[in-house]
């Protein structure tokens, strides 16, 4: 998620900086200067009971660039003074007493009690989004941008919701807007509340004024007693209202729950609270760009309902817990009743609740959008039903339940039974599944001695049975698409057809509560690499990284990376693919890689440790421009969290054209002991690769401690008549050591390799050079049958730069490299040395900008990189 935020904030940051430069605004460089004043406002007129006051003073008078990139949004609504009641703690509602303070990540709130004992909530309309950003983004540009994006939320939207909720028979509060003056009577809460426009509403918005529960209490109750249930149809109505008004922020803490005692159990009905994101909309270019793929759930209030699956992203786990029993017919009926109830007149009345000063700005437009969305709700709602129905979670409780799975008429039926104190069974859950809609059903028993009976499941529906804690019993007479997960240390009983048993001694997912189970969406992220070095010139490339998710596969089911890189000087390109597929066979991961270079930008000076480079010959002459395609696949087993073993096939294809090398060293191969007929013939190899790897570094981008150790054994057989077999071993060890409080980092690298084959091709040789292991020398400067190298590097943090656009860490690098290659029948004790240094910069501590120079007896070489690693080369 950090990558998403950084791309979004960087795009917005450029606009913000441009706006400030244009307006000559002062940039706050100290976070401590922010805080309590950020949400204050001041009235333009006051009488005994009312103040003419804007909701906020932060979002008005935007520059052209701010409007263009960050949007006009609802800035006028925030800035227009509105006749607002004045809050007087001694007189409002007959007098109130503050009992506690609270609030979410962005709002400040207090709980109050009136003289009858009824509780009320008073919370800010404006917000402080500081806490929503991770620590590395707690910098001025990010704080200013995220603060400014509050203008995309309509400050008075909560006033419009009750009329729609009333028409649709959804419990709701009646919010009132108040201006809280700087009143000494507020005591210790004065600093928190003074000079703010706030919303006052009842804490328990139940129709009968009975006490409601928060979601945490609800989860405790429904887990401990299986006769406590959710009114799912009422919840669906409330979620349809969320979709209608584009309220995307509907996670589990945005709800309270009323209770109906039936005499045989309790039914909890939902009460939506905190309608702060209703009508959310930004027309800025930055938000439009971000919502294309990165933040699609924030598309906001448009005439059409876009990407309904993503609109429910914040409620992805919530919906899978509490909308899992409703079938297609119930959805259609509920949606139909909802759209019929929310008439044009209801929408007009609802939007008409906006203050008269505010309505003319966007009121007519909001009315038109709501009517249009209402008309699309049947289609969008059923699309969301199908999305939720693809994979369905069915939960038990901490008591004993009987899960019964059967089939008939091409459908799979799941029933969950509990029992009362007399032992009489009652139905907790019942639903029939269509294999055309549902691909996977997951049963979670949690605690209790649960019983699972699987008579038969529809062939196209995968069934996962998660026993949980307790002595569970399993009776299976099913096809092969049943997977069992239970603790092997627990006494469980299994009879009948054996399922695919995924039980383990430490089944972490069997001990969760339903709200602990996180459903992740598949996502793709853009990648970019930009660099410069003396040999390759300007390098630029783009790509993407994709994550897919599946049951109990952490941190993802698959990761796919596809990157490209182009050398403008060498007129060459490369395409790289890397894939990881988690637990494809038991706990074995599948890893795959492929690389195409056309041509490779390698050098060749001959074989041996003391090959000469003519001072009168241009480097162009030593370029070896051949092409190759390499692919690898392997099964990887993680022996520990830091040690892995992988084994699999490898393929290599080489081809070369004389026309690409006519004026280069490969155009005169006899100078370096090569045969022209051999170097221009196509060669294909296939074989296997064994890799042993240790990875204990603490950060992939900029490690400060840990170890990377890769040991690689490769054997290839020739598939063409002139392709010789190759056997090669390589080892590379890098140790990162924090020498002083993460400010001084020592890096030690040792490595080398050996070719066991008697003969090998020039492009297969062990090499030293460039930025790989001997900086200051050209790429692949030395080539032989064996190699050894040592790199010693010191990275010293110089300062934390509090730049507005690119705050980050600035440091210096110093290094010394030494290496040697050997050839059979050659005697050489020469070790090649180089040294150098440079600067690195870590904006947001997420990616690296580096500039280094390597100095050798032959020349000085420069490298500038922007990406995820120091030293980008082709």
Language-model regions: role of each:
Residues 85-216, 246-247, 267-309, 313, ...:
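Conserved ATP-binding subdomain of kinase catalytic cores across diverse folds
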Residues 283, 455, 466, 472-590, ...:
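Outer-membrane beta-barrel initiation region
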Residues 467, 530-532, 546-548, 566, ...:
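Residue-level signature of outer-membrane beta-barrel architecture
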Residues 555-557, 574-577, 602-610, 657-666, ...:
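Outer-membrane beta-barrel translocator domains and adjoining extracellular loop/strand segments
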């Amino acid at each position: 998620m950090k990558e998403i935020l950084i791309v979004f904030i960087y795009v917005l940051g450029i606009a913000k900086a441009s706006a400030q430069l244009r307006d000559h605004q002062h940039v706050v460089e100290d976070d401590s200067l922010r805080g309590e004043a950020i949400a204050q406002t001041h009235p333009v007129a006051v009488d005994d009971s009312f103040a003419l006051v804007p909701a906020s003073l932060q979002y008005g008078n935007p520059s052209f660039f701010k409007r263009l990139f960050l949007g006009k949004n609802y800035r006028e609504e925030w800035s227009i003074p509105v006749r607002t009641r004045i809050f007087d703690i001694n007189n409002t509602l007959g007098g109130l007493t503050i009992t506690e303070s609270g609030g979410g990540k962005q709002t400040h709130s207090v709980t109050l009690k009136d003289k009858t004992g009824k509780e009320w909530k008073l919370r800010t309309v404006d917000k402080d989004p500081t806490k929503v950003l991770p620590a590395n983004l707690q910098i001025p540009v990010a704080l200013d941008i995220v603060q400014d994006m509050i203008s995309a939320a309509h400050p008075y939207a909560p006033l419009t919701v009750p009329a729609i909720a009333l028409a649709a028979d959804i419990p709701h509060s009646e919010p009132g807007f108040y201006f809280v003056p700087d009143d000494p009577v507020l005591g210790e809460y004065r600093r928190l509340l003074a000079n703010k426009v706030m919303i006052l509403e009842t804490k328990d918005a139940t129709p009968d004024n009975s006490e409601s529960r928060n979601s945490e209490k609800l989860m405790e109750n429904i887990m401990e007693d299986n006769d406590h249930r959710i009114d799912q149809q009422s919840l669906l109505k409330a979620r349809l209202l969320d979709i209608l008004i584009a309220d995307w922020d509907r996670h589990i803490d945005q709800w309270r729950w009323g209770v109906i005692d039936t005499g045989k159990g309790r039914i909890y009905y939902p009460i939506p609270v905190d309608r702060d994101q209703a009508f959310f909309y930004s027309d800025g270019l930055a938000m439009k760009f971000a919502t294309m793929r990165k933040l699609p759930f924030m598309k906001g209030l448009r005439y059409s309902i876009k990407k309904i699956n993503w609109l429910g992203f914040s409620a992805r786990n919530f919906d899978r817990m509490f909308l899992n029993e409703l079938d297609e017919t119930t959805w259609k009926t509920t949606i139909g009743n909802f759209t019929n109830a929310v008439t044009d007149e209801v929408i007009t009345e609802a939007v008409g609740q906006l203050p008269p000063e505010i309505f003319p700005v966007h009121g007519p437009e909001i009315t038109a959008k709501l009517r249009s969305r209402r008309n699309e709700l049947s289609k969008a709602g059923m699309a969301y039903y199908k999305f939720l129905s693809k994979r369905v979670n069915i939960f038990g409780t901490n008591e004993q339940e009987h899960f019964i799975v059967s089939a008939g008429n091409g459908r799979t039926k799941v029933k969950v039974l509990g029992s009362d104190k007399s032992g009489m069974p009652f139905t907790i859950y019942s639903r029939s599944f269509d294999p055309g809609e549902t691909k996977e059903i997951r049963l979670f028993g949690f605690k209790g001695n649960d019983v699972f009976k699987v008579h038969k499941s529809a062939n196209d529906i995968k069934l996962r049975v998660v026993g949980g804690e307790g002595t569970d019993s399993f009776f299976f007479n099913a096809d092969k698409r049943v997977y069992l997960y239970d603790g092997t240390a627990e006494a469980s009983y299994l009879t009948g057809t054996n399922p695919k048993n995924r039980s383990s001694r430490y089944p972490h997912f069997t001990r969760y509560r339903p709200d602990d189970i996180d459903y992740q969406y598949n996502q793709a992220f853009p990648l970019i690499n930009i660099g410069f070095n003396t040999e390759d010139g300007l390098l630029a490339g783009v790509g993407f990284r994709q994550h897919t998710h599946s049951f109990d596969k952490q941190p993802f089911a698959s990761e796919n990376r596809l990157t490209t890189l182009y050398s403008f000087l060498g007129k060459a390109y490369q395409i790289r693919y890397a894939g990881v597929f988690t637990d494809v066979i038991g706990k074995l991961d599948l890893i795959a890689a492929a690389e195409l270079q056309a041509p490779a930008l390698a050098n060749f000076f001959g074989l041996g440790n003391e090959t000469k480079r003519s001072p009168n010959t241009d480097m162009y002459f030593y370029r070896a421009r051949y092409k190759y395609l390499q692919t690898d696949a392997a099964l990887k087993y993680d022996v520990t969290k830091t040690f892995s073993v992988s084994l699999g096939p490898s393929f290599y294809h080489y081809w070369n054209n004389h026309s690409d090398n006519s004026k280069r060293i490969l155009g005169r191969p006899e100078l370096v002991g090569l045969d022209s007929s051999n170097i221009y013939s196509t060669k294909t190899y296939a074989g296997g690769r064994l890799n042993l790897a240790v990875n204990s570094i603490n950060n992939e981008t900029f490690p400060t401690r840990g170890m990377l150790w890769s040991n690689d054994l490769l054997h290839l057989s020739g598939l063409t008549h002139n392709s010789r077999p190759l056997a090669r071993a390589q080892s590379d060890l890098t140790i990162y050591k924090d020498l002083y409080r993460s400010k001084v980092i020592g890096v030690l690298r040792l490595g080398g390799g050996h070719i066991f084959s008697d003969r090998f091709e020039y492009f297969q040789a062990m090499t030293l050079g460039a930025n790989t292991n001997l900086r200051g020398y050209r790429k692949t400067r030395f080539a032989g049958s064996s190699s050894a190298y040592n790199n010693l590097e010191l990275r010293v943090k110089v300062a934390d730069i509090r730049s507005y656009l690119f705050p980050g860490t600035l440091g210096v690098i110093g290094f010394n490299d030494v290496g040697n290659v050997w050839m059979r029948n050659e005697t050489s004790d020469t070790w090649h040395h180089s040294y150098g240094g440079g600067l690195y910069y870590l904006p947001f501590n997420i990616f690296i900008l580096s500039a280094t120079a390597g100095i050798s007896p032959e020349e000085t070489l420069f490298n500038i990189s922007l990406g995820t690693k120091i030293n980008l080369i082709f």
